[in-house]
């Protein structure tokens, strides 16, 4: 499963790729934050810093790959909760 920062970015609209509700979304999520959250969930993420999200192909944002067979939206919500919990 691939996770792009845009999926949980509060500044992005649904059209731009945000998948979680705005109240759960994170301002400027970093690959490092996503990686740490996934590790807290017991998963082993792989970071790809040079990848471009297809909807914003002009900017290099990177992505995270994780071997997860469950519901993607539920995982994204859990990532947001963990990242917000650190603040």
Curated annotation (Swiss-Prot):
SUPFAM superfamilies in alphabetical order: SRP19
UniProt keyword terms in alphabetical order: Cytoplasm, Ribonucleoprotein, RNA-binding, Signal recognition particle
GO cellular component, one term: signal recognition particle
Keyword tRNA-binding in annotation: no
Domain of life: Archaea
Subcellular location: Cytoplasm
Molecular function in Gene Ontology: 7S RNA binding
InterPro entries according to UniProt: Signal_recog_particle_SRP19, SRP19-like_sf, SRP19_arc-type
GO biological process, one term: SRP-dependent cotranslational protein targeting to membrane
Record Pfam families: SRP19
Functional summary from the UniProt entry: Involved in targeting and insertion of nascent membrane proteins into the cytoplasmic membrane. Binds directly to 7S RNA and mediates binding of the 54 kDa subunit of the SRP.
Similarity field: Belongs to the SRP19 family.
Subunit structure: Part of the signal recognition particle protein translocation system, which is composed of SRP and FtsY. Archaeal SRP consists of a 7S RNA molecule of 300 nucleotides and two protein subunits: SRP54 and SRP19.
The protein, known as: Signal recognition particle 19 kDa protein
């Amino acid at each position: 499963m691939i996770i792009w920062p845009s999926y949980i970015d509060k500044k992005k609209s649904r059209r731009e790729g945000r998948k979680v509700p705005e109240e759960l979304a994170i301002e400027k999520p970093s690959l490092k934050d996503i990686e740490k959250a996934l590790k807290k969930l017991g998963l082993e993420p792989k970071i790809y810093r040079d990848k471009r999200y297809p909807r914003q192909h002009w900017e290099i944002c990177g992505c995270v790959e994780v071997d997860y067979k469950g519901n993607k939206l539920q995982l994204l919500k859990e990532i947001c909760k963990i990242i917000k919990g650190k603040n």
